[in-house]
Amino acid sequence: ILMKFFFFIQKGPSHEVHKSIKTLTRIKSPYEILKQETAQGKFLWKRFQHINKRYELLLKDAKKGVTRSKVLLYHYSENQWSFTANLANELMATYPKKVIIIARSKGGEMKCSLRAQFRISDALEKALVGIEGRGGGHPNACGAVIKEEDWAVFLQKFKEEIKRGT
């Protein structure tokens, strides 16, 4: 839970993130946070719970999209909070046989995290040809940003490349 805590307190408006990090520098023990033993620990735990609540709602919604398909695609719109990597990683651990695609629409673009237990970077590279977008990363964990008007074409090409086994 501490790992999730540290990821999540870095999310949100920058003034809230700065306040959380400043408060974190005054923490002497993780139990101050986990057991809310001090005012600083209570503040940080409350902020974490607020962010985690948003995340858990998205995670629950993403799990509703699980089908027999090899690909688990989840799309959400969130202007302030980006959970694409966190969702992709957790869903990959829960559904290791799936190709996970988490996409967040923001500013006319689809910001994506892609995960699989096998190499998908080549499929991503090929799917981006002729598309207004960019992407890359590790062999089985990639990120991409695709213009919304090209999203459907990109998605079709990426799924075809996955089937082909690139």
Where are these predicted regions, by residue range?
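Glycine-rich, acidic loop segments that terminate in or are immediately followed by a histidine
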Residues: 70-166
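A structured phosphate/pyrophosphate-recognition subdomain
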Residues: 1-67, 77-78
